[in-house]
Design a protein with these regions (language model features):
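Cleavable N-terminal export/targeting peptides
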Residues: 1-43
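Subset of outer-membrane beta-barrel
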Residues: 26-354
């Protein structure tokens, strides 16, 4: 046990400092030369940084230090999947985002072998339908443009994840994903009333991105520390415009506050989740969430995804149900997030485990 503990601690600190260095490097900064800037609109494929899962969204998406994860952990910290209870888990969530952007998320994870720790393997999918838009072309007329039908942008990410626990306190995991985005086709030159279309361009692109992370149970009550880095990828180009993916580095803690009281832990649970997030294209901020669970069946949740940042996104809240039936663990989740002048966003999720 001591050997496992020493190994876990060494791995934790090695990965922490390694990823911190790489995060600075991909941003073109070093800890000694960083200049304070207002980081906005510096990345593409932003759908990769949108939190879709209903349970996660309800607690402010502070999921980095989740110890006993599920297949949905691949979207936050793949290492949490290493302690997945049972052998199989599947989950799906739908979300109608701002401007009626339709998100669909699905994941499946399974533990191969029987009685041996071969880790956990998972497959994940995120699909986005941005709806239908009018296609216009600049022209020398009174309006300055003419309409040329419609187009429907889409985006998708398909991932393959793996996680493995070492002992009962440490787990590491990674997720490799193919990312696609199709913004339709467009005309590369303006339309002149006396001329015509010179060329067209196809604005679709694909690339490979990598996520990885670790979780570590400290041994102090149920306190867990986690770290993840998401969306590592090379620079992308649309015709002439270059952009990066939304690289994000996170470190978080989680704990059941009931451990600090005399309350019966079999009846009640109050999970505290806190993440510190450093995105490539947004200000550093804190994510915060609380989840109260009664008898491992009914959960009430609340949180902030951008605590301390002046943005339209506000408080999130939600609820969940868990029930065992014939050996299956069945669950349903709902989340509500206030986006100020943009209205509210709802998420509905279902899951099943065996």
């Amino acid at each position: 046990m001591k050997k496992h503990t020493k190994f876990s601690a060494l791995m934790f600190f090695a990965l922490f400092f390694g990823v911190a260095s790489m995060s600075y490097g991909q941003a073109g900064l070093t800890p000694d030369t960083e200049v304070e800037t207002d980081k906005r609109a510096q990345t593409g494929m932003k759908f990769l940084s949108t939190s879709v899962d209903a349970r996660a969204a309800a607690i402010g998406s502070a999921m980095t230090a989740e110890l006993t994860g599920t297949s949905t952990s691949m979207f936050y910290n793949p290492a949490s999947m290493g302690f997945m209870p049972g052998r199989i888990h599947a989950g799906a969530t739908v979300m109608s985002f701002i401007a009626d952007f339709a998100y669909t998320q699905a994941s499946v994870a399974f533990r191969p072998g029987s009685g041996k720790n071969y880790g956990v393997v998972g497959v994940s999918l995120v699909s986005v339908d941005y709806g239908e838009f009018n296609h216009t072309i600049r022209a020398n007329n009174e309006q300055g443009f003419i309409e040329n039908g419609t187009y429907s942008p889409t985006a998708m990410s398909i991932g393959l994840g793996y996680a493995r626990s070492f002992g009962d306190r440490f787990s590491t995991g990674a997720n490799i994903k193919m990312v696609f985005q199709d913004l339709g086709s467009g005309f590369a030159t303006s339309l002149d009333t006396d001329g015509g279309i010179a060329t067209t361009e196809d604005y679709s692109i694909s690339t490979i991105a990598l996520d990885f992370g670790i979780v570590y149970a400290t041994g102090f009550e149920s306190l867990v520390i986690g770290m993840s880095a998401r969306n590592f990828a090379g620079e992308q180009t649309y015709v002439r415009e270059r952009f990066e993916l939304p690289l994000t580095f996170q470190i978080g803690v989680a704990m059941d506050l009931v451990d600090l009281t005399t309350i019966n832990p079999d009846m009640h649970s109050i999970q505290l989740h806190v993440d510190a997030q450093r995105p490539r294209d947004f200000a550093e901020h804190v994510r915060f969430g609380l989840e109260y669970t009664l008898m491992n069946m009914v959960s009430l949740r609340g949180g902030f995804e951008q605590l301390g940042v002046s943005e339209e996104q506000g408080f999130s809240a939600g609820a969940g149900l868990r029930y065992e039936l014939g050996g299956f663990r069945i669950g349903a989740d709902y989340a509500y997030t206030d986006f100020g002048v943009f209205g509210a966003v709802s998420r509905i999720g279902l899951q099943v485990g065996l």
